[in-house]
Amino acid sequence: MLLWVLFVILILTSGSHCSLPPSPPFRMQRHVDAIFTTNYRKLLSQLYARKVIQDIMNKQGERIQEQRARLSRQEDSMWTEDKQMTLESILQGFPRMKPSADA
């Protein structure tokens, strides 16, 4: 009796004996689909990574351009101030011309 119960349990739990295996063309089609899907996912991942890297590089490029523009404005401002101070010191070095009585 115990053997009979074990035999029935074994038969019921092993579903592979009851169903037929899939036909080879169907299995090949599934395999081809899986290969395509895997490769397509890899391609999409690479494209996404490339886009993210390009976005990061563009943002860095914009920051560098802003910093250069800011530096250029600061240099222009410093040069203008330096030029103004030089001109003022030159003008202060010249004696002031007073109208002479001879003229």
From Swiss-Prot:
Cleaved propeptide residues: 20-30, 74-103
Domain of life according to the entry: Eukaryota
One MF annotation (Gene Ontology) recorded for this entry: neuropeptide hormone activity
Disulfide bridges in this chain: none
Gene Ontology biological process terms, A to Z: adenohypophysis development; adenylate cyclase-activating G protein-coupled receptor signaling pathway; growth hormone secretion; hormone secretion; multicellular organism growth; positive regulation of cell population proliferation; positive regulation of growth hormone secretion; positive regulation of hormone secretion
One family name in Pfam for this protein: Hormone_2
Record's keyword annotation contains Signal: yes
Cellular component, GO annotation: extracellular space; terminal bouton
Record has Secreted as a keyword: yes
Signal peptide: 1-19
Subcellular location: Secreted
Alphabetized UniProt keyword annotations: Secreted, Signal
PANTHER family to which the protein is assigned, alphabetical: GLUCAGON-FAMILY NEUROPEPTIDE, SOMATOLIBERIN
Function noted in UniProt: GRF is released by the hypothalamus and acts on the adenohypophyse to stimulate the secretion of growth hormone.
Entry's family note: Belongs to the glucagon family.
Protein name from the UniProt record: Somatoliberin
Gene label: Ghrh
